[in-house]
Regions:
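Residues forming the flavin
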Residues: 1-19, 23-507
């Protein structure tokens, strides 16, 4: 008997693409076969990928319930694992349940009305809900925690092909129903959600060694929630929370992120460039790409969060600012392909003035983008040909941008740092030699892309607790320990295990 273990493709020769299958085969004489093929890298034992929780709640446990702040992928899986272990977590989120959040998000896209607490960044499912739903990452995963994540997603309604596709994705609409299903699972296991609940402050006590210990949380309505273990899974856009943590003396440090634009091409162009005569084959689907260029000014330009057959979306969470991101549905069937085209920046060179300086840098360029776009949440846009020629765009060409509520054609150099403009101008022709028509004059760029990752790290130790605040467990992308849905979910599992271990050891 056999089952499909992994499916991908080898597209290095675009007119001779190979589909690559890895099979899991049951053999009566497995040991003999493995010995015979001992030198063959393509034949190996099937790994044991079953998840086994390292601890569970003691029978009759009735201690203080752990608290998870944030209901994105990290908080969702931290809450799920704690619930499965028997610890009945309380999950707080400043946003709303996913269906109401979706309505609020469409309010920005259709009517240019922003709800600062319910948008692409905040609410059930986190920022990953409005994305391509990519479910692969580059983090080392010796315990196969990523498999646990995928299996839970399938239980919640995801297509089972995510278990074997080499580059699985879900898409926005499916993520909506999945997070609802997982919420019900957590509640059935004794967990509790509290929506539209913002944490405004921490209650800390000073310890003899100079560090601090968390006692509880002050909430926006004036109430106090006592807690001995708190998972801080707030996401990369929780700027007021980062500012509050800094005021409270929680150890933070600035970390690198990137800034740039979204670039759009017809998906058919990308398919033809990547797959040649095989473009359109149903087993290949919409083509993706990954590009990088080290520019002469010392900067690295790279594609980020590429969304085949998707759209560019308004992703701001603060009034008077414009932010772009990309989103696809499971079908990846929309007309354009889009990707971030971003330039790496780092604290030492670009924002050396403290742990929150990266946030102020983001705000500066997002505010300029809002102004250049017309002050109405329209994004500033520019044709690639005009961008390369250093002239403002006044009209569209063959490619129509997908960003809503609208795009104002202009000069993107007005809302990007000069080093980023120079690096992207240098990179575009290079990428055009790798992906035909990538630098086509009518390709469209919209700005600005600033939320590639968290601009801060809430540094933690080997016990997953804050370096100087006991019982505070920084987690996920907002804390600087993940990037994307899968890595954030994996980190949520690891932190949940650390929380559970601390509860059991304290008894």
């Amino acid at each position: 008997a056999w089952t499909l273990f992994k499916r991908g493709n080898d597209a290095r020769r675009r007119n001779a693409i190979q589909l690559v299958y890895t099979l899991d085969i049951d053999l009566r004489n497995e040991a003999d076969v493995l010995e015979r093929f001992a030198g063959d890298k393509d034949v190996r034992p099937t790994p044991d990928m079953a998840y086994r929780p390292p601890v569970v709640a003691p029978e009759g446990w009735s201690g203080k319930r752990p608290v998870v702040i944030g209901a994105g992928p990290c908080g969702l899986f931290a809450g799920l694992i704690l619930a499965q272990m028997g610890f009945r977590p309380i999950i707080l989120d400043r946003g709303k349940v996913v269906r109401q959040r979706t309505k609020d998000t469409w309010g920005l896209w259709r009517q240019a009305k922003l709800n600062p607490d319910s948008n692409v960044q905040f609410g059930e499912g986190g920022a990953g809900t409005f994305s391509d739903g990519k479910l692969y990452c580059r983090v080392k995963d010796p315990r196969f925690l990523g498999r646990k994540v995928l299996e839970e997603f399938v239980k919640a309604g995801a297509p089972d092909d995510i278990l074997w596709e080499a580059h699985p994705h879900i898409g926005t609409f499916r993520l909506v129903t999945m997070v609802e299903s997982m919420r019900r699972t957590i509640e059935e296991l004794g967990g509790e959600y509290r929506w539209e609940t913002r944490v405004d402050d921490l209650e800390l006590e000073r310890l003899p060694d100079g560090n601090q210990r968390l006692r509880g949380l002050h909430l926006h309505d004036g109430s106090f929630l006592e807690a001995d273990q708190v998972v801080m899974a707030v996401g990369h856009s929780a700027r007021p929370t980062f500012e509050m943590l800094h005021r409270r003396g929680v150890f933070l440090e600035a970390k690198p992120f990137s800034i740039g634009v979204r670039i759009e091409h017809p998906q058919s162009w990308v398919d033809q460039a990547r797959y040649g005569k095989c473009a359109g084959h149903p087993d290949l689907g919409a083509a993706a790409y990954s590009l990088a260029h080290h520019a002469s000014n010392g900067r690295t330009v790279y594609s980020f969060c590429m969304c085949p057959g998707g759209r560019v979306v308004a992703a701001t969470s603060e009034e008077g600012r414009v932010v772009t991101n990309g989103m696809s549905q499971y079908s990846r069937a929309e007309f354009n392909a889009n990707s971030g085209l971003v330039v790496g920046i780092d604290p030492a060179r670009d924002y050396p003035d403290g742990p929150l300086a990266g946030i102020e840098l983001q705000r500066h360029w997002e505010s300029l983008a809002f102004e250049v776009g017309g002050g109405n949440y329209h994004a500033p846009g520019q044709r690639v040909g005009d961008f390369l020629a250093a002239r403002a765009s006044t009209a569209l060409g063959e490619v129509v941008p997908s960003y809503k509520p609208g795009v104002t054609m202009t000069d993107l150099s007005r809302c990007l740092p000069a080093f980023a403009v120079d690096a992207i101008r240098e990179a575009l022709p290079v990428f055009g030699r790798q992906i035909a028509r990538y630098d086509h004059p009518d390709a469209v760029m919209t700005g600005v892309e600033t939320r590639t990752s968290s601009p801060v790290r809430i540094t933690r130790g080997k016990d997953f607790q804050s370096l100087n605040v006991e019982r505070l467990f920084p987690a996920g992308e907002g804390a600087g320990y993940a990037g994307g849905i899968l890595s954030a979910a994996i980190d949520g599992i690891k932190v949940a295990e650390a929380v559970a271990a601390s509860i059991v050891s304290a008894r």
